A protein has these predicted regions:
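Catalytic phosphate/metal-binding cores of nucleic-acid and nucleotide-processing enzymes, i.e., regions
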Residues: 1-96
Length: 96
């Protein structure tokens, strides 16, 4: 993982926690392409996130595409903090 991608993960997890979401790093347990994080709102609504290098430099593998298709609307690829904030506010209905 590149430094830029790790920094993005940390910043996005901080934002999620400020909104009261649990941020769970998913283990690489032999399932290739599994998303990086699971974000959970109280009550169970969940969003799987695959972080990609900021600036569009990250490549999506065939395995990552499989998981994106399998998880459907509860999966997103994120390459910016602003994009992440917008996604979680809309997905989890976090409007004030």
């Amino acid at each position: 993982m590149k430094k830029e991608e790790r920094k993005l993960e940390v910043e996005c997890c901080t934002i999620a926690r400020k909104f009261g979401l649990a941020a769970v790093k998913l283990e690489k347990n032999g399932n290739k392409g599994i998303p990086d994080y699971l974000f959970i709102k109280r009550g169970g609504r969940s969003l799987y996130v695959e972080f990609k290098r900021p600036g569009g430099g990250g490549v999506v593998s065939a395995e990552q595409r499989f998981w994106a298709d399998f998880l459907g609307d509860s999966h997103v690829f994120v390459d910016s903090v602003g994009g992440f904030a917008k996604v979680i506010v809309e997905f989890f209905d976090l409007w004030d």
